[in-house]
């Protein structure tokens, strides 16, 4: 997922689909608070309970 795509979800309650280190698909329901760039690690999606590496995110769906 690109930064420009993820930026559209800031402030929204979302279901985020991502791949863990074993390659298995996981889902997390979280409120997307911000995007954060960490030098040498890349961009992270900051939620209300966890941070996900943006390169591992495969999809985001807004929840009502």
Regions found by a protein language model. Give the residues of each.
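Short beta-rich binding modules
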Residues: 1-13, 17-64
């Amino acid at each position: 997922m690109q930064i420009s795509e993820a930026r559209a979800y800031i402030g929204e309650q979302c279901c985020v689909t991502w791949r863990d280190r074993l390659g298995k698909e996981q889902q997390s329901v979280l409120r997307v608070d911000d995007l954060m760039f960490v030098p040498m690690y890349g961009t992270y999606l900051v939620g209300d309970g966890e941070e996900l590496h943006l390169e591992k995110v495969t999809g985001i769906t807004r929840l009502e």
